[in-house]
């Protein structure tokens, strides 16, 4: 199993650079119809009207400028969770963000977009109990989302038309469910996948990530938003009969591998930004930081997010005793759960990796123990290791079951 780092470009033109030209004769470039990267004025103005009405809500959904929050939630799988957590960490360094705003990783592990349906309470309960509740938040406080997701069951070769239509329908069902479980959700930014040319052909998700699948994914996002703008009743975002939140592009992420795109010079480097055994979709810490900075810069400057993401006079009453991301200064110790620690691949052929999803302020001790209780590997790390991605090598050790033990402060976790 390894990344296909030799496939560092495809020759495909990023949707942001394609302009008024067409892909496959049918799919015009640009993030929006007409081959442009800016939303239609009418749609943008409606979005401005929506965000002007955003107010901090308490856990019961009441407007409260003292303790309430405007929650920005990141939705998707682990490809969203890691970078979004890195963005939350970066936000600590800024003093000019809205103290009434709280960003929360609401991604749900390895589930695909087909799990995001009304009635699949297990999926939504997990987010409520392990993502929101641990931050003293409730679903009713979620008002803005960032979504990057795809289907794991719909294969895609070189054919784009059917794949785009299928994925748009998947998005529509998911967004309808998001509106159901988050009744105050007003606005969702949607991003297409980044470059997928480094995908590992031995991985189960290869068909989802490989090119041109990731490239096609961006046209699906464009078509989704186009249909809402064009008045598709299943994507209605206003009452009466609201079905989904207002949709607009989040940061566009697809660039042709190492080829800088004209739009902003973005590239994706296999060797430094993609995890060795991450399938071509899990990023290294460097890659997560890169995507986190893209997200943070986007929210700081976007026309629709600047008014509620950045600080201003209307948010002054939320400021005392809070960090820029809305968390309280000197909070109680973060509750770390088993879900915040990812060990992969499992099973392993000798080399495995550990990824911590939460900020870790306590010392970390990691041990690997064999079946008779012998410690075969032991490492210790200081308290300043947030969002760290570690590699461990058991090559040369006898095959069998090993137990991974991690001690964060005085709290132990074990996984075989």
Feature map (PLM): residue ranges:
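A Trp-anchored, charged/polar loop motif used as the substrate-binding/catalytic surface
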Residues: 49-60, 118-137, 166-176
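C-terminal outer-membrane/trafficking sorting elements
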Residues: 335-344, 348-416
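Extracytoplasmic/secreted proteins, especially bacterial periplasmic and envelope-associated proteins
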Residues: 82, 86-89, 162, 166-173, ...
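Catalytic His-Asp segment of secreted/periplasmic serine-dependent ester chemistry enzymes
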Residues: 195-326
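N-terminal secretory targeting modules
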Residues: 1-75, 79-89, 307-326
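Sec-exported extracytoplasmic/periplasmic mature domains
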Residues: 80, 88-92, 132, 150, ...
